[in-house]
């Protein structure tokens, strides 16, 4: 059986970027604060990740506003709900990814999408485009590519978790299978993949913060080119986002250590 993800993992620059990110995660997991406060660190990381994910979509809310539960924008609320839901979806992600994506959309797009469209693949060709990626693929083409993505998730691969997570993230972000809140769903699915495929089993890494700090839209446009160079650049971007997410979580640990 072919392993297209393993081929992507060998693109120039990808092995080195992935290895650097993995080493960063390994260093984070040795932080002494995590011996006693791992759940608290994960909770804070998830909050910062949700804030960053909403900011990428154009709604930037300060962390202290989120902590006081004073952010009422539906997109921000959707990002927070998706972040909270991930902990309940992990065991299902490998077995029923379609079900998980639908559930993520239900919680992420509530208040943005008519009730009857929540969790359902779009039947129309139009989709929101907050990153100015251009028109989304037609609904029929999107459905076909989604089947291919779900097939990738179901077959074994020798590719590192970062590569799988990067491809899942990019396909959801560029296909926009639901038409609204697809970016929130895409970044949630990436984080879920990093957790469930072993890179970050405690969900500590605020990878969304890394995406916000980097040239996220440009990296997705590189992926859209479909060339080995473009796809490789996207995976390297995702690896760099993991490393920056580790830096963010390390700062959380240091703050807790200081008390």
PLM regions with names:
Residues 1-259:
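FIC/Doc superfamily catalytic core
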């Amino acid at each position: 059986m072919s392993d297209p993800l393993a081929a992507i993992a060998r693109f120039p620059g990808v092995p080195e970027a992935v290895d650097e990110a993995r080493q960063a995660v390994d260093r984070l997991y040795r932080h002494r604060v995590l011996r006693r406060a791992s759940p608290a660190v994960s909770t804070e990381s998830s909050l910062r990740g949700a804030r960053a994910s909403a900011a990428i979509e154009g709604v930037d809310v300060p962390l202290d506003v989120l902590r006081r539960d004073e952010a009422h924008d539906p997109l921000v609320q959707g990002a927070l709900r998706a972040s909270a839901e991930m902990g309940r979806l992990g065991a299902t992600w490998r077995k029923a990814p379609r079900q998980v994506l639908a559930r993520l959309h239900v919680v992420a797009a509530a208040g943005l999408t008519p009730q009857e469209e929540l969790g359902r693949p779009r039947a129309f060709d139009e989709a929101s485009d907050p990153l100015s990626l251009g028109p989304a693929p037609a609904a029929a083409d999107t459905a076909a590519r989604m089947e291919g993505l779900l097939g990738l998730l179901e077959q074994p691969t020798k590719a590192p978790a970062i590569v799988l997570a990067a491809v899942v993230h990019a396909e959801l972000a560029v296909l926009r299978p639901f038409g609204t809140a697809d970016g929130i769903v895409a970044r949630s699915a990436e984080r879920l993949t990093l957790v469930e495929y072993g890179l970050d089993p405690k969900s500590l890494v605020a990878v969304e913060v890394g995406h916000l700090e980097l040239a996220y839209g440009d990296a997705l446009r590189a992926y859209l080119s479909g060339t080995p160079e473009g796809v490789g650049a996207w995976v390297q971007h995702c690896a760099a986002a993991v490393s920056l997410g580790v830096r963010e979580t390390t700062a959380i640990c240091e703050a807790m250590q200081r008390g």
